[in-house]
From Swiss-Prot:
Essential for the assembly of ubiquinol-cytochrome c reductase. It has a direct effect on the correct occurrence of the Rieske protein, core 4, core 5 and apocytochrome b. The lineage of its organism: Eukaryota, Fungi, Dikarya, Ascomycota, Taphrinomycotina. It is found in: Mitochondrion inner membrane. It is a single-pass membrane protein. GO terms for biological process: mitochondrial respiratory chain complex III assembly. The chain crosses the membrane at residues 8-24. This is Assembly factor cbp4. Belongs to the CBP4 family.
Amino acid sequence: MNRVVKSIVYGVGIVGFGYMTMKLTTPSPERVVNSLPPDLRASYEMNKKDRSQAEGVLRMIEDAKRNPKNLV
């Protein structure tokens, strides 16, 4: 039984170390965007607006599929 507990503790330690290393070294999405050059950042923002508009249209289409009676 002692070996099982020891193995579990070591396993949790190894996985925990890997997880903490990932969390500490991976930048946040905002940090990545802020580190972009101005021209790429402007392009990213423009594409982000286009994506949000497209998602809005897709959401409207899905709503129309679910509730066809609401169509005018």
